[in-house]
Amino acid sequence: MPRLEESEIKKYWQIFQSLKPQNNKLTGDQLSSILKNSQLPQQQLSAIWELSDIDNDGKLDFEEFCIIMRLIFDVINGKLPNVPQELPSWLIPASKSAIIQANKAVNQGNNNFGDIDDDEDDKLSNDFDWYISPTDKSIYEKIYDSKCDSFGRIKYSSLNELYNGLTNVPSSEISSAWNLINPKSFETIDKDQTLVFLHILNQRENGKRIPRGVPASLRATFSKEVPNYDLSAQAKPSISATTETGKKSFAENYLNKIGGGVGASSTINNGRNEKGTDFSATQGTDWEEVRLRRELQDLERLLDKVQNDTKNQKDNSNNNQDNNDMLIKYEFEQLLKYKQNQLNSTTNASKNSTDLSSVKQDIEEIQNQVNTLQEFLTTKNQELLKLNQQIESLK
């Protein structure tokens, strides 16, 4: 099956954000509606959740959310007849490949990438020294400078060539060291974490057993506080003469390779660490940072455009300002004239209404007089008729 496409990851990001994650993680309750809408059996959904929740914290970050969405879609569409027993390598986030390798080593009781025999483990000493000498620090910084990205971050896979040159450090121990300095399982680590990570590998290469925890001052370093490389208060302050004389030079071959071309990229991969899907799709520490940087660039371009448009409009407005003022004055004068005409019309209408009432009264009086004259005429006509009748009778 193909890797996750960038467009697919962006689609999952929109869904992820719409569910309003808390601390960049989603709970089972927040995902319940999506899981139910898939109409997959509960047994399959549980198996998919177990595969997706790589760090076993009961919540899914964005990378784990991408995994569960892709697995659900592939099962629904028939691309996967059944839920796989383990994640395919192309679906494993690069930031969590070390966790999966460590979990395999614990669950299976062995490590496919190189086990530690009991006899070899017995040879390891417990006098692990957290102190980073100036010489070692200089070596670690050279390695860091050769592999850090533009944000000053280091990926686990970017040091594959260094891992290949370690003869006494199995892959499981490299993963353990990475998890020790990267407790939040980020895809990348900063400079302070890188220096401590390389120091742990250096100590392990020289026969020191990797401890299970880190001093409090280093935990503060991993929390982005000011680092303190002199940890004599928490660990043994000095290194014995026998240790110094018998100490193996760390990453000597690797330093010789990068000495002539610090910026060269490594193409060597011994197969111990398959490169998983890069969910960031761009350089950066996380999607939120990349998104904000893009938005900032868009806003800067928009601001430049607005400033240029405003400048052009200002130049044009200086030429047209006088004409605009005259036009506005003319429009207001016409409005005033219109309002005055309306007022005059209203006054005249009121006067005309008074004159009309007087005329109506005159008409009514004339009508009454006409009626009276008509009655008088009728009476006289009747009298004339009687006189005419009398004259006729006398004849």
UniProtKB/Swiss-Prot annotation:
This is Actin cytoskeleton-regulatory complex protein END3. Ca(2+) binds at D53, D55, D57, K59, E64. Residues 305-325 are annotated as: Disordered. Residues 305-314 have a biased composition (Basic and acidic residues). It is a peripheral membrane protein. One of its GO terms (biological process) is actin filament organization. InterPro entries: EF-hand-dom_pair, EF_Hand_1_Ca_BS, EF_hand_dom, EH_dom, End3. The keyword Repeat applies. Induction: Regulated by GCN4 and induced in response to amino acid starvation. GO terms for cellular component: actin cortical patch; actin cytoskeleton-regulatory complex; cytoplasm; endosome membrane; plasma membrane. Keywords: Actin-binding, Calcium, Cell membrane, Coiled coil, Cytoplasm, Cytoskeleton, Endocytosis, Endosome, Membrane, Metal-binding, Repeat. Belongs to the END3 family. Residues 40-75 form the EF-hand domain. It comes from Candida albicans (strain SC5314 / ATCC MYA-2876). Component of the PAN1 actin cytoskeleton-regulatory complex. One of its GO terms (molecular function) is actin binding. It comes from the Eukaryota. Residues 285-395 form a coiled coil. Residues 315-325 have a biased composition (Low complexity). Residues 8-98, 136-225 form the EH domain. It holds the Pfam family EH.
